[in-house]
Amino acid sequence: MGLTSRPTPASRQPASPPPADPVLLPEPKRLGVLSRLAPEPMKVVLNWGRRYSLWVFNFGLACCAIEFIAASMARHDFIRLGVIPFAPGPRQADLMIVSGTVTDKMAPAVKRLYEQMPEPKYVISFGACSNCGGPYWDSYSVTKGVDQIIPVDVYVPGCPPRPEALLQGILKLQEKIARESLAERYATGATGGGPSTDALRSGLVAAPTAPGPTAPASTAPGPTAPAPTQDEERR
């Protein structure tokens, strides 16, 4: 009886776990068209400075403005979050907080003050009246939300909201600032295009008009009108 070599069983190797998906961190693009020229540490520093140095312009219109004052005092103290209250005016402010009922008569003033703020600028709608009209939504003289006049970044609900709600809204705004790109937010993008989507939605920037095809000038003389006859001249 001949000896034959028995096949050796394949060595059992533990199944390798599937490769984990790489964690993709958001690239800090916050310098618009200059983002490709600035070093990465500089982008982080500039973004950090924008998040934690928000000068606030409070546009108080009703009782929600009292809650804003309470949030800025020592008990809640939103200065510890990097928010500086009571800017001298809209030209020195980064953040406008609209608190209270916006009437149709006040709407042009809200829009004008928003236009005076320098870029980058942000808006928090504070309270039900500013969000959608609140208890006075069915009034003939009340604007149904300040977002019909200017773009809003964060909505804080409540009638009136507590100061803690405003602190939460400020944190949400800082999170939004951390992941946004100035090239996408403002008028000119990195591709050199026209106004951004936010700028067009705000109604403050006119949409660019595409140049249409122009008709070629004709060099051939057109048909001339016949000379009037003597009968037509008498008439």
From Swiss-Prot:
- For region Disordered, the annotated ranges are 1-24, 188-235
Protein name, UniProt field:
NADH-quinone oxidoreductase subunit B 2
What are its GO cellular component terms? plasma membrane; respiratory chain complex I
- Summarize the protein's role: NDH-1 shuttles electrons from NADH, via FMN and iron-sulfur (Fe-S) centers, to quinones in the respiratory chain. The immediate electron acceptor for the enzyme in this species is believed to be a menaquinone. Couples the redox reaction to proton translocation (for every two electrons transferred, four hydrogen ions are translocated across the cytoplasmic membrane), and thus conserves the redox energy in a proton gradient.
Q: Could you tell me the superkingdom of the organism this chain comes from?
A: Bacteria
Describe how the cofactor binds. Binds 1 [4Fe-4S] cluster.
Which top class of enzyme applies to this chain?
Answer: translocase
**Keyword flag 4Fe-4S:** yes
Topology in the lipid bilayer is annotated as:
Peripheral membrane protein
**Would you identify the family this protein belongs to, as annotated?**
Belongs to the complex I 20 kDa subunit family.
- Transmembrane regions: none
Quote the InterPro entries the UniProt record gives: NADH_UbQ_OxRdtase-like_20kDa (IPR006137), NADH_UQ_OxRdtase_20Kd_su (IPR006138)
Q: Which cofactor does it need?
A: [4Fe-4S] cluster
Annotated Gene Ontology MF terms? 4 iron, 4 sulfur cluster binding; iron ion binding; NADH dehydrogenase (ubiquinone) activity; NADH:ubiquinone reductase (non-electrogenic) activity; quinone binding
User: What is said about its interaction partners and assembly?
Assistant: NDH-1 is composed of 14 different subunits. Subunits NuoB, C, D, E, F, and G constitute the peripheral sector of the complex.
Q: Where in the cell is it found?
A: Cell membrane
What is the name of the gene encoding this protein?
A: nuoB2
> Which UniProt keywords are listed?
4Fe-4S, Cell membrane, Iron, Iron-sulfur, Membrane, Metal-binding, NAD, Quinone, Translocase, Transport
Principal location class: membrane
